[in-house]
């Protein structure tokens, strides 16, 4: 590379800040996913992400220290951190890692709805409880987070104004889950077969 370009204002105030910004996006995005993996029990994958995260961070902070009198580098460093945090959360949401527990509370009759859930292969636990306005049914399900959109559709079909909550689950030792055809990612919507066993 031309030595003159390396000492030019374009390189110092343009290219270097851009590289710092991109490096921060990468390492913070990886760090966000790593933290979520740790919280959800992916203990063997998280260290791999940690290695790349800290390596990229060292490259970024090294350039900041090498250009410590360049204020644009500080702006790029902070902006990259903010953008990386947002992008990391978006990536994790699209990856749909881990398990979740869905808790549905309804005063409506649930026999047909529960039968439909079980037909699709979901493990359902239901109990009768007392709500503010009378008797209600509480339905519990532990599912892969990738299945939440499908369950949300089923719940809206059952009751468009249903009250339900979704919480992360670190791990699930045993349970009933839909079997998926690996050649058809949409097979869950067609096959009511079950898998009984461990899910991590």
UniProtKB/Swiss-Prot annotation:
Topology in the lipid bilayer: Multi-pass membrane protein
Keyword list, A-Z: Cell membrane, Membrane, Transmembrane, Transmembrane helix
Location relative to the cell: Cell membrane
One Pfam family in the UniProt entry: DUF5698
Gene Ontology cellular-component terms listed: plasma membrane
Alphabetical list of InterPro entries matching this protein: DUF2179 (IPR019264), DUF5698 (IPR044035), N-reg_PII/ATP_PRibTrfase_C (IPR015867), UPF0316 (IPR022930)
Listed transmembrane segments: 3-23, 44-64, 71-91
Source taxon at top rank: Archaea
UniProt family annotation: Belongs to the UPF0316 family.
Listed name of the protein: UPF0316 protein Mhun_0543
Gene source species: Methanospirillum hungatei JF-1 (strain ATCC 27890 / DSM 864 / NBRC 100397 / JF-1)
